[in-house]
């Protein structure tokens, strides 16, 4: 049982590395990194050249506590996509590199990406 968990974790890291080795965020075109846990979603704009986070939001943020958007579902992903697009606009960012990590571009990730595109981000 433990060996299976270790194998799954290693495969997940391997997928993330495989995706991220092709992605590089800059100040003009940062990386939009999306992380999913068992209960939350998190999105960040990252400048890899300087190693800084330009902005981010998550379902566990104060503004989403005790609301319908504090859980990991498509409605929350849509709200986070809109929020991250607003953050990017405030920083004069129009283009990003989408980093899905080890996750498939499906369901919650696709919903977040579509909402970010609807908010004005291009990727």
From Swiss-Prot:
Q: Which domain of life is it from?
A: Bacteria
Q: Which GO terms describe its cellular component?
A: cytosolic large ribosomal subunit
Q: Which InterPro entries match?
A: Ribosomal_uL18_bac-type, Ribosomal_uL18_bac/euk
Q: Which UniProt keywords apply?
A: Ribonucleoprotein, Ribosomal protein, RNA-binding, rRNA-binding
- Secretion signal span: none
- A GO biological process held by the record: translation
Asked if the record carries the keyword Nuclease, the reply is no
As for family, the record states: Belongs to the universal ribosomal protein uL18 family.
Q: What does this protein do?
A: This is one of the proteins that bind and probably mediate the attachment of the 5S RNA into the large ribosomal subunit, where it forms part of the central protuberance.
Q: How does it assemble?
A: Part of the 50S ribosomal subunit; part of the 5S rRNA/L5/L18/L25 subcomplex. Contacts the 5S and 23S rRNAs.
State what protein this is by name: Large ribosomal subunit protein uL18
**Gene name?**
rplR
């Amino acid at each position: 049982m433990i060996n299976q968990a270790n194998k799954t974790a290693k495969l997940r890291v391997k997928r993330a590395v495989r995706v991220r080795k092709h992605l590089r965020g800059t100040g003009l075109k940062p990386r939009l990194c999306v992380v999913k846990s068992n209960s939350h979603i998190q999105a960040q704009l990252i400048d890899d050249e300087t190693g800084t986070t330009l902005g981010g939001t998550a379902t566990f943020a104060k503004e989403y506590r005790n609301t319908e958007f504090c859980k990991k579902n498509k409605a929350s992903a849509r709200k986070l996509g809109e929020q991250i697009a607003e953050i990017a606009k405030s920083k004069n960012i129009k283009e990003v590199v989408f980093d899905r990590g080890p996750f498939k571009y499906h369901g919650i990730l696709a919903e977040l990406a579509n909402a970010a595109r609807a908010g004005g981000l291009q990727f």
